[in-house]
Swiss-Prot record:
Gene name for this UniProt entry: rnz
Record-listed Zn(2+) 1 binding positions: H63, H65, H143, D213
Subunit-structure text: Homodimer.
Pfam families xref list: Lactamase_B_2
Name by which UniProt lists this protein: Ribonuclease Z
Length: 304
């Protein structure tokens, strides 16, 4: 089975702490890396995880609060120093171009590669990127400024060849790749053997949803229904719910309720407020509602 894993580079919130880095994750899917959010310190975390800079082609920014995007200027500059030549694509909500363009002009105008900026309508659920491995959809979130989550949906994987059937019909080996991709087979005498008689369905595609930052927002549930893994911010505990409401963030219990309603297979919480020195309370609060909950931590890798 092809790799589909999530690397946690940072899971803290706005205020810097000695125990968590600002938000950033990297998805490793087949032959590519996809970054979600790019807080300060991301370059060191990227190296700690032994991730290859050259495999990263797309960066997705959730919103323009500093703890989610202040790592971008340094990261973009470093890629140039490393001799990158392939285009880097940066996706984000309205304002992403105003944020990046002056930086690119001032510090990165002689780089050996191009940066393409793609503005996303944070109010719409839409397909924002597609390649041979994945489709990426926007998830409208509810925060103090335009914020967007991301749903990564693996492309349908190839069907499994029924070797006994292939041998029965004397199908040449050269035809196997086409059959695995879904083609019927025509025998030398002109008979058409339907693909369903020659293959079985491939493994269901895996799905990962990233939802941060946002207040409790049940409207996202239909979009993320049945995901294999849901990352949902859990900035506060229920005892600080008033502060969560004031700042348009979620509690751990609310994150778990979203996971429960969506029928997610697993929940990953993060974006912890700096007031909590230990995240065990946040984890237990979430698990009281949705048992298969994991507390994110730096340098953690979760396989889907």
């Amino acid at each position: 089975m092809a790799a589909f894993s999530v690397h946690i580079l940072g899971c803290g919130s706005a205020l810097p702490t000695t125990h968590h880095h600002p938000s950033s994750q990297v998805i490793d899917l087949r032959d590519k890396l996809y970054m979600i959010d790019c807080g300060e310190g991301v370059q060191r975390q990227f190296r700690h995880e032994k991730l290859h800079f050259g495999r990263l082609i797309h960066i997705f920014i959730s919103h323009l609060h500093g703890d989610h995007c202040f790592g971008l200027p340094g990261f973009i500059s470093t890629l140039g120093l490393l001799g990158r030549t392939g285009t880097l694509h940066v996706h984000g909500p309205e304002g992403i171009e105003r944020f990046l363009s002056p930086i690119l002009e001032q510090f990165c105008h002689r780089m050996p590669y191009q940066v393409e900026i793609h503005t996303i309508d944070a109010s719409r659920h839409a397909l924002v990127h597609e390649d041979k491995s994945v489709k990426v959809y926007s998830i409208p979130l509810s925060h103090r400024i335009p914020a967007v989550g991301y749903l990564f949906e693996e492309k349908c994987r190839a069907r499994h060849l029924n070797k006994a059937a292939a041998e029965f019909y004397n199908i040449p080996l050269a035809e196997y790749p086409l059959i695995i991709e879904g083609s019927d087979y025509t025998t030398p005498d002109g008979r058409i053997i339907p693909n369903r008689h020659l293959t079985t369905p491939g493994t269901p595609p895996r799905r990962y949803a990233y939802c941060s930052d946002t207040e409790f927002c049940p409207s996202i549930v239909p979009i993320i229904q049945g995901v294999d893994l849901l990352y949902h911010e859990a900035t506060f505990m229920e005892e600080d719910r008033a502060r969560a409401k004031e700042t348009f963030h979620s509690t751990a219990k609310e994150a778990a309720e979203i996971a429960r309603q969506a029928g997610a297979k697993r929940l990953l919480i993060g974006h912890y407020s700096g007031r909590y020195k230990d995240v065990q309370g946040l984890l237990e609060e979430a698990q009281s509602v949705f048992k298969p909950t994991i507390a994110a931590n730096e340098r953690m890798r979760i396989d889907l």
